[in-house]
Structures are given as structure tokens and as C-alpha cells.
From Swiss-Prot:
Protein name (Swiss-Prot/TrEMBL): Unknown protein from spot 445 of 2D-PAGE of etiolated coleoptile
Protein source organism: Zea mays
More about this protein: On the 2D-gel the determined pI of this unknown protein is: 6.1, its MW is: 45.3 kDa.
Organism superkingdom: Eukaryota
Length: 15
């Protein structure tokens, strides 16, 4: 789940 540009999504990749 993408929250912010400096957050890690559920996939573990930096958005």
C-alpha cells in the first residue's frame, strides 16, 4: 500500500 514517496509499500519496494 503506497502512502508517501518516502514510504515502503506492501511489496517492500520504495515507492
Amino acid at each position: 500500500t503506497q502512502v508517501t514517496v518516502e514510504y515502503v509499500n506492501e511489496g517492500g519496494a520504495m515507492v
